[in-house]
Amino acid sequence: MRIATWNVNSVKQRVPRLLPWLDQRAPDVVCLQELKLTEDVFGELLGSELEARGYEWAALGEKSWNGVAILSRVGLTDVTPGLEGGPGFPHQEARALAATCGGVRVHSLYVPNGRVPDSDHYAYKLEWLARLREVVAAGPADAVVCGDMNIAPADADVFDPAAYVGHTHVTAPERDALNALLACGLRDVVRDRWPDERVFTYWDYRAGMFHKDCGMRIDLILASEPVAKRVEAAWVDRQARKGTGPSDHAPVIVDLDTAPDGDIGPMVPPPSARPSRGRTKLPQAKIVDRG
């Protein structure tokens, strides 16, 4: 079973890339984030195309912001929209969707950005993550928790850790919250597979960050131990970040039981740019966006 997660940063803008990508990579389960439209519009836009490809789907959206979806060719049952008992800002946002797919409880997540440390939104992010941990801990043994976590797990997951000092995504409380989630019995399967490699999933649109390979690894697939033992490949589909009109995030793909493309990775294709040796000015878009 192939499971993928992708922050598409507006599904309406990404349709010309999403559908060919589904045909090329043939994932069995896809978690999407940042739909930026309602579930009704999602269905009007993609419903027939997905059904023609054998996908059932569920979405939770809101106009212009946030939004998550799960597409599945291996069953889609027990759909739970929203983070049960989770906090709002001020109301619950379209950030979490769970369903059972092929016997695995799958969570598609768009974790709050946090915006600025010590802000109300930052506190909301930490409270949201604490509630997520409770939900996952109470869930079934076979689980995948994935999406845009808006946290780089370690300094190795940031192109220039010094550039992010004082910003969200890398603070100790955020990483502690992520580690508490992992302590529920989850494994960071990409990092497990590639413990010493430079791996990113997000590159700011500006300042040539993608071509310089100045990115962050904030899109994660976390798997419970029974599922993690089935992993045969785990990689970032960097090809989907190239070309015209991409999302600023690349899909992350995990293959269970069999690996159709072999044990490839960590980023496919690998970047041609050498790691930046000097300080690179940090674009602000990811830090101050509404997410």
List each model region and its residues.
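Surface-exposed cleft-lining segments at the edges of enzyme active sites
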Residues: E84-P87, V111-L129, A162-H167
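Short amphipathic alpha-helices and their capping/turn segments at secondary-structure boundaries
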Residues: L18-D23, R95-G102, A130-A141
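Short proline/glycine-enriched turn/loop segments at secondary-structure junctions
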Residues: M209-H211, A240-P246
